[in-house]
């Protein structure tokens, strides 16, 4: 397997797909809420990681590849956070803003156990023609420059039949 992994080092990889922000709130549970029979998590740490197709790109970077991401994100705080994370890692991208919020998966962990996951996303996001064309144009521009194409489809709208 090391031979296969070494063979992709230095490759330029186009990642097309649904990017997401994974947010974690970690804390301790010492009591049950008086309002409802649910644990109260006293949050001691919060952090974000790249999720979905963005996580694929991060993993490719870790394998020595040069990922290039084409995707959509919201014109919101979480979208800005993701753009900063891509910049900090040096991952090239073309991320087009949509009117929908950035897909965000928020997990609350209490005493090392996941208590709940909150999904911030629009159900069955459909691309308008303009955004679809921007994605297609970005993919067409990138194809001559890359060695590998990865499609990371989570069913959130980027990878439709046209794209």
Identify the role of each PLM range.
Residues 1-30, 45-163:
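Ribokinase/PfkB-type carbohydrate-kinase core domain
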Residues 31-35:
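Flexible glycine/proline-rich, aromatic-decorated loop/lid segments
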Residues 37, 41-44:
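Divalent-cation-assisted or electrostatically stabilized phosphate/pyrophosphate-binding catalytic cores
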